[in-house]
């Protein structure tokens, strides 16, 4: 009788130990899978972030190269508008371009606004206001349709959405970051922009 009782106790302990080991093993597997998935998700997001930064930098460098060859492109005008708006105060300003083959076309006077009002300066005043819509003046010697072609800044159009202004802001900010990280950025920033 005593032997039977001891065998029962041993079997019960053995059963509970087996259950405990199985549960512990399952928990370990779950934790390993969870940490592996978490690690791969973190790596994936880090790779996506660096890839996005890389393509933004490449796009900014390509934009600089394209603007050096064809400075009258709309995106170039858009980014330069942001850079002039950043230091603008709502008045007409005179910008002097450097002479040379790679310089931008001679520019005249144009409307500037602070950074926070770029979308309004681009798209005109919001509905319900009586403020006059700012008009872009010609940035080429030939006027809007002169010998040098169309001007860099066309008249403001209400069809331009806020997304266009946001694109200009983000794109120009990326260009500014690229210029600030490159050697000799101070001189080139004034020459190219």
From Swiss-Prot:
GO terms for cellular component: host cell membrane; membrane. Its main location: host cell. The chain crosses the membrane at residues 15-35, 36-56, 160-180. It comes from the Viruses. Keywords: Host membrane, Membrane, Transmembrane, Transmembrane helix. It is found in: Host membrane. It is a multi-pass membrane protein. This is Protein B4. It comes from Human herpesvirus 6B (strain Z29) (HHV-6 variant B).
